[in-house]
Amino acid sequence: MANQIDESKPISDLEIMRHSAAHIMAEAVLSMFPEAKLGIGPAIDTGFYYDFDLPRTLTPEDLPEIETRMNQLVKSNLPFRREEMSKDEARKLFANQPYKLELLNDITDETVSIYRQGNFCDLCRGPHVNYTSKVKAFKLLSIAGAYWRGDEKRPMLQRIYGAAFLDKASLAEYLNMLEEAAKRDHRKLGKELELFSLHQEIGGGLVNWLPNGAIVRHLIEEFWKKEHLKRGYDLVYTPHIAKVDLWKTSGHWGFYRENMYSPMDIDGEEYVLKPMNCVYHILMFKNRTRSYKELPIRMAELGTVYRYERSGVLHGLSRVRGFTQDDAHIFCLYDQLEKEVVKVLDLAKFMIDTFGFTKYKVMLSTRPEKYVGELDKWEYATDILAKALEANQIPYQVDPGEGVFYGPKIDIKFEDALGRTWQGPTIQVDFQLPERFDVSVVGEDGKDQPVAMVHRTVLGSMERFMSCLTEQYGGAFPAWLSPKQVMVIPIADRHTEFAEKLACELREEEVRVEVDSRSETMNQKIRQAQLAKIPYMLVVGDKEIETQSVAVRTRTGSQQVMPFAEFKSMLLAKIKTKSTEI
């Protein structure tokens, strides 16, 4: 197998180089810890990692030494050499590497390949760069725990992450982005701005929304509800638990059980926390006999669901165990499907544009290995989604095998201010659940007619969307979403009455405003408001009282004196239009 770099494929070249960087790091670690046991070391989106079983716990202070040894290996210009051997020969070579032996046992071919560079060899398909000197721009970033093969019952290994790029300028740009991302981390900002809290006494992945975060969530939800009502959806509410038999009928118990919580016994029957809202909406639809003339019927719910996540993958608001989906299910005739998906795409684009996400990529995820239903219906559903994307002139990529067990789906991933992608709207066509629950309508001929179903979210979960929104704006939310929109700052005590009068006028317009009448200096009050990321500060003193004006300071530092009436008009316009500009 060739291991040459193909310069006509820069993305592939980058992946090859990153994989080679992982091997170089493994050799460096082995030079420090000769008794180390090796896991795996692949290339990933921004670099590489390698998993190690080591005699002691690594600390961040170890990374510079590992990096120094890597640089020495790079300067040595060592060749990467590919060899093929029998599995028996490989077992002898890796006799002291139990994880490699386990991987060898999983390989069905009798011949395997290894790669060597310097004093290091690894079980590997490759390809790699020709020489270590080709790995020119890398940086070790962090250490984390990782269970062997992702199984919590297996040993915990130590994973070292690194970044790697084709040139130092690209690496520097990425490291700057990481530095900015750390400042915007929603976990850090969530604490500083008092948006949410997590408590071990409650349990991992279960979120408390604090007043500031609750206001932002409320505003998002109110906007969501109004927009859905405007577009012909009916709002519904459903319980948080249901009998296990319901999930057996739906197929979730067979296909999704590992993500569900254990049943609880209630009056001798087994109940379980719901992982999804769809089955409840199906039963609502079946609540009475329906005519084909009533379709489409669109049910929307901000429904809280519970899914088991391993403790090691929980992450602030973006990976939790209990979350609220902006969920909806559309029941329609087969010939209405394409039109309904087109409408959902239009709604999804409108929603994410409103929140300031203008760049996104779209994936069409097709049938997975584990699925239910007939192949012809899968193909028909996939074709419907593709036609809807094309009708909206939305470019997309096919993501083979990434659909859900009951149908294909469209995934829209939007890009934030730092160029990172986040999971956004999802649209799924489903013929299987309606069949399992015998969902039908009375057709034009008086006979039962089958119904298709569209599952969709436009924001994802409220928790994950809030984490994304917080990092997109660095906690400095647009005025319409800010927990506090205005802080009025009287220069002296004698100006407090005027400040309160202005605040009262703003409250009558439902503006979220406070007066800072503390006995602090004006500069201290301004600084405090800026740290709280309040969009507007209105400083008032003798001149402002005399002219009925305000000295407006924005959180970005710009200043302007204007009549209070003009400021109020400007602010209300920004709130009404949901402007992302201050």
Curated annotation (Swiss-Prot):
This protein's encoding gene: thrS
Single GO cellular component term: cytoplasm
Cofactor(s) demanded: Zn(2+)
Domain of life: Bacteria
Positions of the UniProt region annotated as Catalytic: 185-478
Keyword Ribonucleoprotein: no
CDD domains, per database record: ThrRS_anticodon (cd00860), ThrRS_core (cd00771)
InterPro entries from the UniProt entry: aa-tRNA-synt_IIb, aa-tRNA-synth_II, aa-tRNA-synth_II/BPL/LPL, Anticodon-bd, Anticodon-bd_dom_sf, Thr-tRNA-ligase_IIa, Thr/Ala-tRNA-synth_IIc_edit, ThrRS_anticodon
Binding positions (Zn(2+)): 278, 329, 455
Pfam families xrefs: HGTP_anticodon (PF03129), tRNA-synt_2b (PF00587), tRNA_SAD (PF07973)
Native species: Dehalococcoides mccartyi (strain CBDB1)
GO MF term set: ATP binding; metal ion binding; threonine-tRNA ligase activity; tRNA binding
Record-linked SUPFAM superfamilies: Class II aaRS ABD-related, Class II aaRS and biotin synthetases, ThrRS/AlaRS common domain
Cofactor binding note from Swiss-Prot or TrEMBL: Binds 1 zinc ion per subunit.
Protein family according to the UniProt entry: Belongs to the class-II aminoacyl-tRNA synthetase family.
Job description of the protein: Catalyzes the attachment of threonine to tRNA(Thr) in a two-step reaction: L-threonine is first activated by ATP to form Thr-AMP and then transferred to the acceptor end of tRNA(Thr). Also edits incorrectly charged L-seryl-tRNA(Thr).
Database matches in HAMAP family: Thr_tRNA_synth
One BP term from GO: threonyl-tRNA aminoacylation
Keyword Zinc annotated: yes
Subcellular location field: Cytoplasm
Record's protein name: Threonine--tRNA ligase
